[in-house]
């Protein structure tokens, strides 16, 4: 969980911007998208091997 403590004399916009940046660094949005739908283990393995093949030929 990302926490942001609003500093004294800090605008809400800048605090929200810091919070969004922390969430992006933590990978929360990607994790939510990944877990949105169930993915069978065989499909996970297939995607993983395709990604490895793609990296190898790049």
From Swiss-Prot:
InterPro entries in alphabetical order: Ribosomal_bS21, Ribosomal_bS21_CS, Ribosomal_bS21_sf
Region entry Disordered, spans: 32-58
GO cellular component, as recorded: ribonucleoprotein complex; ribosome
Composition-biased stretches (Basic and acidic residues): 32-42
A GO molecular function held by the record: structural constituent of ribosome
Keywords from the UniProt entry: Ribonucleoprotein, Ribosomal protein
One biological process term in Gene Ontology: translation
Composition skew (Basic residues), residue ranges: 43-58
Similarity comment: family membership: Belongs to the bacterial ribosomal protein bS21 family.
PANTHER family: MITOCHONDRIAL 28S RIBOSOMAL PROTEIN S21, SMALL RIBOSOMAL SUBUNIT PROTEIN BS21
Identification of the protein by name: Small ribosomal subunit protein bS21
Protein's organism: Lachnoclostridium phytofermentans (strain ATCC 700394 / DSM 18823 / ISDg)
Encoding gene per record: rpsU
């Amino acid at each position: 969980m990302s926490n942001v403590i609003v500093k004294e004399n800090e605008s809400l916009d800048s605090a929200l911007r810091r919070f969004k940046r922390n969430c992006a660094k933590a990978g929360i949005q990607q994790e939510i998208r990944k877990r949105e739908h169930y993915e069978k283990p065989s499909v996970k393995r297939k995607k993983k091997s395709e990604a490895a093949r793609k990296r190898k030929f790049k």
